[in-house]
């Protein structure tokens, strides 16, 4: 259980310290909650922060659960940086079904990314098994067997606003 996204991001960034100093590397976050985590990782590692706009299609009656996902090309917060031949640390505040992250990974591979490290605070074991063959490295702090929604693993899990995302990306 994490206190909030800040605590989760700090814990995750400590597991990524070996990436500090890697050239041609970028942290990419899934907006909006993932940007809080991504900002901490990027600042800790001295890497640029960008976003990959994979959006979930919510399950009716369970908005935190993805029925599917797609790449949003509206570029609300700016475009996804060039990832060709780069090392990417892909992050979010957690993974439930894996649909959103899987969509992001496929998008990055089409853009000829160099290597992908998927780093998230929490994801269910069955989803981790499904995703591990899609990335070069997987760093997940908690992999519970019983999983309802990402928010269950945070004491404080408010919605992140567009304004907060813009501020994190600007600073």
Predicted regions and their residues:
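PRPP-associated nucleotide enzymes
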Residues: 1-171
